[in-house]
Regions:
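Conserved residues at beta->alpha junctions
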Residues: 21, 98, 145
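Loop/turn elements at helix/coil->beta-strand transitions in domains of secreted/extracellular proteins
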Residues: 11-13, 34-37, 60-61, 91-92, ...
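A structural signal for short loop-to-beta-strand junctions that line the ligand-binding cleft
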Residues: 56-68
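Bilobed "Venus flytrap"/periplasmic-binding protein-like clamshell domains
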Residues: 1-9, 13-16, 71-138
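Residue-level detector of flexible, active-site-proximal loop/helix-junction positions
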Residues: 22-24, 69, 101, 131, ...
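Pocket-lining segment of extracytoplasmic ligand-binding domains
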Residues: 42, 53, 118-189
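Structural signal for conserved beta-strand scaffold positions within catalytic alpha/beta enzyme cores
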Residues: 19, 64-67, 96, 126, ...
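Pocket-flanking alpha-helical
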Residues: 16-57, 75, 83, 130-135, ...
């Protein structure tokens, strides 16, 4: 992996890979000055650099080395839930991603831009993508947010599950409000 390549090709560097909760946790580690490189999403990186949102009052002096791949926001449900649009999340059980992850950050932004309140309008769970898929299959949640590349195997596997009809909830109407508040970080495909 990347740690092995860095250790092999960067003189004097001994890199190790560390499992974290995602972009926010990675950026918090960068802020300690101990790791030199981390994988993060652009919106979480900008928040860290500006010292806003989860980094309020604690800006992190980060620099971007490379963009590896574009991430896509998935708002995933199944037809049995009755969720057809973002407003239908009201009163539902929704996973907004692992706590402290960039999925959670972006989910909160999409929810707000769609005119919903993450604390009052839904019952929230904080699950990773695999846990969210299992919870949706078991009908413990009604929908989940996930930010990742295409294809994401957990979402693909959900769609291939017998008896499950996958529903991707359109959230493109939230884009203008997100760009207005956070800048041109978000685009429609």
């Amino acid at each position: 992996g990347m740690a092995a390549a860095l250790s092999k090709y960067v003189p004097g560097m001994q890199a190790t890979a560390e499992v974290t909760g995602g972009s926010v946790a990675n950026l918090q580690l960068i802020g300690t000055g101990k790791p030199y490189i981390a994988l993060t999403m652009a919106d979480a990186t900008l928040d860290a650099y500006k010292g806003q949102d989860k980094f309020t009052g604690k800006p992190v002096p980060v620099r971007t080395l490379a963009v590896l791949y574009p991430n896509r926001m998935h708002v995933v449900s199944i037809t049995a839930s009755g969720i057809k649009k973002m407003a239908d999340l009201k009163g539902k059980r929704v996973s907004t991603g692992s706590g402290g992850s960039a999925t959670e950050v972006m989910a909160f932004r999409v929810i707000e831009a769609a005119g919903l309140d993450k604390d009052r309008d839904m019952t929230r769970e904080r699950l990773g993508v695999a846990e969210s898929v299992n919870a949706l299959k078991d009908r413990k949640i009604d929908a989940f947010f996930w930010v990742g590349g295409l294809p994401t195997s957990a979402v693909t596997d959900l769609g291939a599950t017998p008896g499950i009809k996958l529903k991707l909830v359109d959230h493109s109407d939230a884009l203008d409000a997100m760009v207005k508040k956070y800048g041109p970080l978000y685009v429609k495909d």
